[in-house]
Amino acid sequence: MISAYEQLVAEGYLNSQKGSGFYVAVELPEQYLPEPSSVQRDSSPKAHFDINRAFAPGVPDLDAFPMAQWQKLLTRHMSRTCLLGNQDIQGSWTLRCALADYLASSRSVNCSPERIIITSGAQQALSIATMVVLKQGDKVLMEQPGYAQMRKLIQFQNYQFEPLFVREKLGFDVEAVTSSDADALYITPSNQYPMGTTLNTEQRGKIINWAVEQSSWIIEDDYDSEFQFAHRPYTSLQGLAAQMGRDDRVLYVGSFSKVMFNGLRLGYLVVPERLVEQCLVVKDALSGDSPTHTQEALADFITEGGLLRHIRKMRRLYKTKHEQMHLSIQQYFGDRVCVVSQAAGLHITLKWQDGMDEQRFTKMAEHEGSSCDL
Protein backbone atom coordinates (compact mmCIF):
# COMPACT_ATOMS: atom_id res chain seq x y z
CA MET A 1 0.00 0.00 0.00
CA ILE A 2 2.78 2.44 0.95
CA SER A 3 4.59 1.67 -2.29
CA ALA A 4 1.45 2.52 -4.27
CA TYR A 5 1.14 5.91 -2.55
CA GLU A 6 4.83 6.63 -3.10
CA GLN A 7 4.45 5.81 -6.78
CA LEU A 8 1.50 8.23 -7.08
CA VAL A 9 3.58 10.94 -5.39
CA ALA A 10 6.45 10.29 -7.79
CA GLU A 11 4.10 10.62 -10.78
CA GLY A 12 2.61 13.88 -9.45
CA TYR A 13 -0.92 12.71 -8.58
CA LEU A 14 -0.49 13.05 -4.79
CA ASN A 15 1.36 15.33 -2.40
CA SER A 16 2.86 14.01 0.82
CA GLN A 17 2.88 16.06 4.02
CA LYS A 18 4.95 14.76 6.92
CA GLY A 19 2.82 13.87 9.93
CA SER A 20 -0.40 14.57 8.05
CA GLY A 21 -0.76 12.16 5.16
CA PHE A 22 -1.29 12.15 1.42
CA TYR A 23 -3.42 14.64 -0.53
CA VAL A 24 -4.57 14.86 -4.13
CA ALA A 25 -2.30 17.23 -6.03
CA VAL A 26 -3.83 20.57 -7.05
CA GLU A 27 -1.90 20.55 -10.31
CA LEU A 28 -2.14 17.18 -11.98
CA PRO A 29 0.53 15.94 -14.42
CA GLU A 30 0.33 17.37 -17.91
CA GLN A 31 0.64 13.89 -19.44
CA TYR A 32 -0.87 10.59 -18.39
CA LEU A 33 0.42 7.11 -19.03
CA PRO A 34 -1.24 5.86 -22.22
CA GLU A 35 -3.38 2.77 -22.02
CA PRO A 36 -1.57 -0.14 -23.63
CA SER A 37 -2.96 -0.80 -27.07
CA SER A 38 -4.38 -4.15 -28.02
CA VAL A 39 -1.41 -4.64 -30.33
CA GLN A 40 0.99 -4.21 -27.43
CA ARG A 41 -0.96 -6.62 -25.25
CA ASP A 42 -0.95 -9.27 -27.95
CA SER A 43 2.69 -8.85 -28.98
CA SER A 44 4.23 -11.10 -26.31
CA PRO A 45 6.23 -14.00 -27.75
CA LYS A 46 4.23 -17.16 -28.26
CA ALA A 47 7.02 -19.35 -26.94
CA HIS A 48 9.92 -18.64 -24.62
CA PHE A 49 13.29 -19.42 -26.18
CA ASP A 50 15.72 -20.72 -23.56
CA ILE A 51 19.17 -19.69 -24.72
CA ASN A 52 20.74 -21.99 -22.12
CA ARG A 53 18.76 -25.08 -23.06
CA ALA A 54 20.24 -28.53 -23.66
CA PHE A 55 23.25 -28.55 -25.99
CA ALA A 56 23.30 -24.75 -26.26
CA PRO A 57 26.74 -23.93 -27.75
CA GLY A 58 29.34 -22.64 -25.31
CA VAL A 59 27.22 -23.05 -22.17
CA PRO A 60 28.94 -25.02 -19.38
CA ASP A 61 27.16 -27.21 -16.84
CA LEU A 62 25.74 -24.40 -14.71
CA ASP A 63 24.29 -26.75 -12.09
CA ALA A 64 27.77 -28.04 -11.27
CA PHE A 65 29.18 -24.64 -10.34
CA PRO A 66 29.85 -24.13 -6.58
CA MET A 67 27.35 -21.30 -6.23
CA ALA A 68 27.35 -21.25 -2.42
CA GLN A 69 31.11 -20.75 -2.34
CA TRP A 70 30.89 -18.05 -5.02
CA GLN A 71 28.12 -16.23 -3.16
CA LYS A 72 30.25 -16.27 -0.01
CA LEU A 73 33.15 -14.65 -1.87
CA LEU A 74 30.88 -11.97 -3.34
CA THR A 75 29.41 -11.19 0.08
CA ARG A 76 32.92 -10.84 1.50
CA HIS A 77 33.59 -7.87 -0.79
CA MET A 78 30.15 -6.24 -1.05
CA SER A 79 30.67 -4.34 2.22
CA ARG A 80 33.99 -2.80 1.11
CA THR A 81 33.09 0.83 0.44
CA CYS A 82 36.47 1.41 -1.23
CA LEU A 83 35.19 -0.68 -4.15
CA LEU A 84 32.11 1.48 -4.74
CA GLY A 85 33.87 4.29 -6.59
CA ASN A 86 35.80 4.42 -9.85
CA GLN A 87 38.49 1.78 -10.20
CA ASP A 88 41.62 1.03 -12.20
CA ILE A 89 40.56 0.69 -15.83
CA GLN A 90 43.19 -2.03 -16.31
CA GLY A 91 41.42 -4.18 -13.74
CA SER A 92 41.87 -5.18 -10.13
CA TRP A 93 45.53 -5.45 -9.16
CA THR A 94 44.70 -8.39 -6.89
CA LEU A 95 43.01 -10.23 -9.75
CA ARG A 96 45.81 -9.49 -12.19
CA CYS A 97 48.38 -10.87 -9.74
CA ALA A 98 46.32 -14.01 -9.17
CA LEU A 99 45.73 -14.40 -12.90
CA ALA A 100 49.42 -14.01 -13.75
CA ASP A 101 50.27 -16.88 -11.39
CA TYR A 102 47.41 -19.03 -12.66
CA LEU A 103 48.27 -18.53 -16.35
CA ALA A 104 51.96 -19.20 -15.70
CA SER A 105 51.29 -22.49 -13.90
CA SER A 106 48.40 -23.79 -16.02
CA ARG A 107 49.18 -22.46 -19.51
CA SER A 108 52.88 -21.44 -19.32
CA VAL A 109 51.90 -17.89 -20.28
CA ASN A 110 54.77 -15.48 -19.75
CA CYS A 111 53.37 -12.27 -18.28
CA SER A 112 53.41 -9.92 -15.33
CA PRO A 113 50.31 -8.30 -13.78
CA GLU A 114 51.31 -5.07 -15.55
CA ARG A 115 50.73 -6.73 -18.93
CA ILE A 116 47.26 -8.11 -18.15
CA ILE A 117 44.09 -6.17 -18.98
CA ILE A 118 40.81 -7.36 -17.48
CA THR A 119 37.94 -7.17 -19.98
CA SER A 120 34.21 -7.82 -20.20
CA GLY A 121 34.68 -11.26 -21.71
CA ALA A 122 36.84 -12.55 -24.54
CA GLN A 123 34.87 -10.65 -27.17
CA GLN A 124 35.88 -7.28 -25.73
CA ALA A 125 39.46 -8.50 -25.47
CA LEU A 126 39.41 -9.37 -29.18
CA SER A 127 37.92 -5.97 -30.02
CA ILE A 128 40.63 -4.15 -28.08
CA ALA A 129 43.41 -6.28 -29.56
CA THR A 130 42.37 -5.74 -33.17
CA MET A 131 41.68 -2.01 -32.75
CA VAL A 132 45.17 -1.48 -31.32
CA VAL A 133 47.28 -3.44 -33.80
CA LEU A 134 45.22 -3.08 -36.99
CA LYS A 135 43.76 -0.33 -39.14
CA GLN A 136 40.94 -0.39 -41.66
CA GLY A 137 41.85 -2.38 -44.75
CA ASP A 138 44.43 -4.56 -42.99
CA LYS A 139 44.29 -8.27 -43.78
CA VAL A 140 43.37 -10.78 -41.08
CA LEU A 141 44.09 -14.46 -41.63
CA MET A 142 41.55 -16.56 -39.74
CA GLU A 143 40.62 -20.22 -39.44
CA GLN A 144 37.69 -21.31 -41.58
CA PRO A 145 35.40 -22.63 -40.23
CA GLY A 146 36.06 -20.61 -37.12
CA TYR A 147 34.69 -18.42 -34.37
CA ALA A 148 31.68 -16.60 -35.85
CA GLN A 149 31.94 -13.63 -33.47
CA MET A 150 35.49 -12.92 -34.62
CA ARG A 151 34.33 -13.02 -38.23
CA LYS A 152 31.68 -10.41 -37.36
CA LEU A 153 34.33 -8.23 -35.72
CA ILE A 154 36.54 -8.39 -38.81
CA GLN A 155 33.62 -7.35 -40.99
CA PHE A 156 32.49 -4.59 -38.61
CA GLN A 157 35.96 -3.03 -38.42
CA ASN A 158 36.39 -3.18 -42.21
CA TYR A 159 39.39 -5.47 -42.16
CA GLN A 160 40.10 -7.81 -45.05
CA PHE A 161 39.19 -11.41 -44.28
CA GLU A 162 41.53 -14.13 -45.56
CA PRO A 163 40.33 -17.69 -44.84
CA LEU A 164 42.70 -20.28 -43.42
CA PHE A 165 40.96 -23.52 -44.27
CA VAL A 166 40.94 -26.18 -41.55
CA ARG A 167 40.98 -29.81 -42.66
CA GLU A 168 39.33 -32.66 -40.78
CA LYS A 169 41.68 -34.24 -38.23
CA LEU A 170 44.71 -32.47 -39.78
CA GLY A 171 44.03 -28.82 -39.06
CA PHE A 172 45.20 -26.06 -41.36
CA ASP A 173 48.29 -26.13 -43.55
CA VAL A 174 50.99 -24.13 -41.77
CA GLU A 175 52.51 -23.30 -45.16
CA ALA A 176 49.36 -21.29 -45.88
CA VAL A 177 50.36 -19.08 -42.96
CA THR A 178 54.06 -18.77 -43.71
CA SER A 179 53.32 -17.81 -47.32
CA SER A 180 50.70 -15.21 -46.36
CA ASP A 181 51.20 -11.45 -46.27
CA ALA A 182 48.43 -10.98 -43.69
CA ASP A 183 48.83 -8.25 -41.09
CA ALA A 184 47.44 -10.48 -38.35
CA LEU A 185 46.62 -14.12 -37.70
CA TYR A 186 43.74 -15.11 -35.42
CA ILE A 187 43.95 -18.73 -34.24
CA THR A 188 42.68 -21.11 -31.57
CA PRO A 189 45.77 -23.38 -31.47
CA SER A 190 44.95 -25.47 -28.38
CA ASN A 191 41.47 -26.56 -29.47
CA GLN A 192 40.44 -25.21 -32.85
CA TYR A 193 36.80 -24.23 -32.92
CA PRO A 194 34.82 -26.02 -34.26
CA MET A 195 36.99 -28.72 -35.87
CA GLY A 196 38.87 -29.52 -32.66
CA THR A 197 42.38 -29.82 -34.09
CA THR A 198 45.55 -28.86 -32.20
CA LEU A 199 48.83 -27.32 -33.34
CA ASN A 200 51.97 -29.14 -32.23
CA THR A 201 55.13 -27.42 -31.00
CA GLU A 202 56.88 -27.47 -34.39
CA GLN A 203 53.90 -25.89 -36.13
CA ARG A 204 53.63 -23.21 -33.48
CA GLY A 205 57.32 -22.39 -33.83
CA LYS A 206 56.96 -21.86 -37.58
CA ILE A 207 54.01 -19.52 -37.05
CA ILE A 208 55.88 -17.52 -34.42
CA ASN A 209 58.87 -17.09 -36.73
CA TRP A 210 56.57 -16.00 -39.56
CA ALA A 211 55.00 -13.29 -37.39
CA VAL A 212 58.37 -11.86 -36.37
CA GLU A 213 59.87 -11.98 -39.87
CA GLN A 214 56.75 -10.45 -41.50
CA SER A 215 56.10 -7.95 -38.67
CA SER A 216 52.63 -9.46 -38.38
CA TRP A 217 50.56 -10.06 -35.27
CA ILE A 218 49.30 -13.28 -33.72
CA ILE A 219 46.07 -13.11 -31.74
CA GLU A 220 45.91 -16.34 -29.75
CA ASP A 221 42.46 -17.25 -28.45
CA ASP A 222 43.11 -20.00 -25.89
CA TYR A 223 39.59 -21.34 -26.32
CA ASP A 224 38.63 -24.37 -24.18
CA SER A 225 42.29 -25.15 -23.47
CA GLU A 226 41.44 -26.38 -19.96
CA PHE A 227 39.37 -29.30 -21.21
CA GLN A 228 41.55 -31.78 -23.09
CA PHE A 229 40.50 -35.41 -22.68
CA ALA A 230 42.68 -37.34 -25.13
CA HIS A 231 46.11 -35.95 -24.21
CA ARG A 232 47.86 -33.40 -22.05
CA PRO A 233 47.30 -29.89 -23.40
CA TYR A 234 50.14 -28.12 -25.16
CA THR A 235 51.50 -24.99 -23.54
CA SER A 236 50.19 -21.73 -24.91
CA LEU A 237 51.65 -20.39 -28.13
CA GLN A 238 52.45 -17.18 -26.25
CA GLY A 239 54.48 -19.15 -23.71
CA LEU A 240 56.43 -20.92 -26.45
CA ALA A 241 57.09 -17.59 -28.14
CA ALA A 242 58.47 -16.25 -24.85
CA GLN A 243 60.82 -19.25 -24.58
CA MET A 244 62.04 -18.40 -28.09
CA GLY A 245 62.44 -14.74 -27.12
CA ARG A 246 59.83 -13.82 -29.75
CA ASP A 247 56.63 -13.01 -27.87
CA ASP A 248 56.60 -9.33 -28.85
CA ARG A 249 54.14 -10.07 -31.69
CA VAL A 250 51.67 -12.21 -29.71
CA LEU A 251 48.46 -11.08 -28.00
CA TYR A 252 46.84 -13.68 -25.76
CA VAL A 253 43.08 -13.80 -25.11
CA GLY A 254 41.09 -15.83 -22.60
CA SER A 255 37.96 -15.79 -20.47
CA PHE A 256 36.22 -17.56 -17.60
CA SER A 257 32.94 -18.17 -19.44
CA LYS A 258 33.58 -21.88 -20.08
CA VAL A 259 35.42 -22.79 -16.87
CA MET A 260 32.92 -20.94 -14.63
CA PHE A 261 29.74 -19.49 -16.16
CA ASN A 262 28.82 -17.23 -19.09
CA GLY A 263 27.12 -14.56 -17.00
CA LEU A 264 30.39 -13.72 -15.24
CA ARG A 265 31.47 -11.64 -18.27
CA LEU A 266 35.12 -11.43 -17.27
CA GLY A 267 37.96 -12.06 -19.70
CA TYR A 268 41.55 -10.98 -20.06
CA LEU A 269 44.06 -9.79 -22.60
CA VAL A 270 47.82 -10.30 -22.25
CA VAL A 271 49.84 -7.96 -24.46
CA PRO A 272 53.45 -6.88 -24.96
CA GLU A 273 54.37 -4.10 -22.54
CA ARG A 274 54.57 -1.49 -25.29
CA LEU A 275 50.88 -1.99 -26.15
CA VAL A 276 49.41 -1.69 -22.66
CA GLU A 277 48.69 2.05 -22.72
CA GLN A 278 47.12 1.92 -26.18
CA CYS A 279 44.89 -0.95 -25.10
CA LEU A 280 43.73 1.00 -22.04
CA VAL A 281 42.84 4.01 -24.20
CA VAL A 282 40.68 1.76 -26.40
CA LYS A 283 39.09 0.01 -23.42
CA ASP A 284 38.24 3.36 -21.84
CA ALA A 285 36.54 4.46 -25.06
CA LEU A 286 34.58 1.21 -25.31
CA SER A 287 33.32 0.68 -21.77
CA GLY A 288 35.59 1.85 -18.95
CA ASP A 289 36.39 -0.34 -15.97
CA SER A 290 34.90 -3.77 -15.21
CA PRO A 291 32.75 -4.63 -12.12
CA THR A 292 35.18 -4.55 -9.19
CA HIS A 293 33.37 -6.66 -6.58
CA THR A 294 33.23 -9.53 -9.05
CA GLN A 295 36.93 -9.13 -9.84
CA GLU A 296 37.88 -9.26 -6.16
CA ALA A 297 35.74 -12.34 -5.60
CA LEU A 298 37.34 -14.02 -8.62
CA ALA A 299 40.82 -13.19 -7.29
CA ASP A 300 39.97 -15.00 -4.04
CA PHE A 301 38.43 -17.90 -5.97
CA ILE A 302 41.75 -18.33 -7.78
CA THR A 303 44.17 -17.81 -4.88
CA GLU A 304 42.19 -19.99 -2.47
CA GLY A 305 42.23 -22.89 -4.93
CA GLY A 306 38.55 -22.83 -5.83
CA LEU A 307 39.10 -22.36 -9.56
CA LEU A 308 41.55 -25.24 -9.94
CA ARG A 309 39.34 -27.58 -7.92
CA HIS A 310 36.36 -26.65 -10.07
CA ILE A 311 38.30 -27.14 -13.31
CA ARG A 312 39.53 -30.59 -12.24
CA LYS A 313 36.01 -31.62 -11.29
CA MET A 314 34.56 -30.32 -14.55
CA ARG A 315 37.30 -31.95 -16.61
CA ARG A 316 36.24 -35.35 -15.23
CA LEU A 317 32.56 -34.55 -15.70
CA TYR A 318 32.94 -33.28 -19.27
CA LYS A 319 35.10 -36.26 -20.21
CA THR A 320 32.33 -38.59 -19.02
CA LYS A 321 29.71 -36.56 -20.89
CA HIS A 322 31.85 -36.48 -24.04
CA GLU A 323 32.29 -40.27 -23.96
CA GLN A 324 28.57 -40.83 -23.39
CA MET A 325 27.64 -38.43 -26.16
CA HIS A 326 30.03 -40.19 -28.53
CA LEU A 327 28.48 -43.57 -27.68
CA SER A 328 24.96 -42.20 -28.13
CA ILE A 329 25.84 -40.77 -31.54
CA GLN A 330 27.17 -44.16 -32.63
CA GLN A 331 24.13 -45.94 -31.20
CA TYR A 332 21.46 -43.77 -32.79
CA PHE A 333 23.14 -42.59 -36.01
CA GLY A 334 25.67 -45.31 -36.79
CA ASP A 335 27.55 -44.78 -40.05
CA ARG A 336 25.33 -41.88 -41.08
CA VAL A 337 27.52 -39.41 -39.19
CA CYS A 338 31.22 -39.05 -38.50
CA VAL A 339 32.68 -37.27 -35.47
CA VAL A 340 35.42 -34.98 -36.79
CA SER A 341 36.39 -33.10 -33.62
CA GLN A 342 38.89 -34.33 -31.05
CA ALA A 343 38.03 -35.36 -27.50
CA ALA A 344 38.18 -31.88 -26.01
CA GLY A 345 36.12 -28.87 -25.07
CA LEU A 346 32.38 -28.45 -24.68
CA HIS A 347 31.29 -29.41 -28.19
CA ILE A 348 31.31 -32.25 -30.68
CA THR A 349 31.47 -31.56 -34.41
CA LEU A 350 29.66 -33.97 -36.73
CA LYS A 351 29.71 -34.57 -40.46
CA TRP A 352 26.72 -36.13 -42.19
CA GLN A 353 27.70 -38.95 -44.55
CA ASP A 354 24.37 -39.40 -46.34
CA GLY A 355 23.54 -35.84 -47.35
CA MET A 356 21.26 -35.10 -44.41
CA ASP A 357 19.71 -31.63 -44.58
CA GLU A 358 21.31 -29.73 -41.66
CA GLN A 359 18.47 -27.21 -41.55
CA ARG A 360 15.94 -30.01 -41.16
CA PHE A 361 17.99 -31.68 -38.44
CA THR A 362 18.34 -28.39 -36.56
CA LYS A 363 14.58 -27.87 -36.58
CA MET A 364 14.09 -31.42 -35.32
CA ALA A 365 16.55 -30.76 -32.49
CA GLU A 366 14.83 -27.50 -31.56
CA HIS A 367 11.49 -29.31 -31.46
CA GLU A 368 13.00 -31.65 -28.85
CA GLY A 369 14.36 -28.72 -26.82
CA SER A 370 17.99 -29.04 -27.95
CA SER A 371 20.39 -26.79 -29.83
CA CYS A 372 23.05 -27.30 -32.44
CA ASP A 373 25.17 -24.99 -34.58
CA LEU A 374 25.57 -25.26 -38.33
In which residue ranges do the predicted regions lie?
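General small-molecule cofactor/ligand-binding pocket signal
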Residues: 117, 162-164, 251, 340, ...
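Conserved core of the PLP fold type I
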Residues: 77, 81-215, 219, 225-227, ...
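Short beta-strand segments
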Residues: 56-57, 165, 186-188, 219-222, ...
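Conserved core segment of the aminotransferase class I/II
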Residues: 70, 245-246, 251-316
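N-terminal basic, amphipathic alpha-helical segments
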Residues: 2-75, 84, 280, 284-291, ...
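Short beta-strand "wing" residues that participate in macromolecule-binding interfaces
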Residues: 15-16, 111, 372-373
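Conserved PLP cofactor-binding pocket of PLP-dependent enzymes
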Residues: 227, 366-374
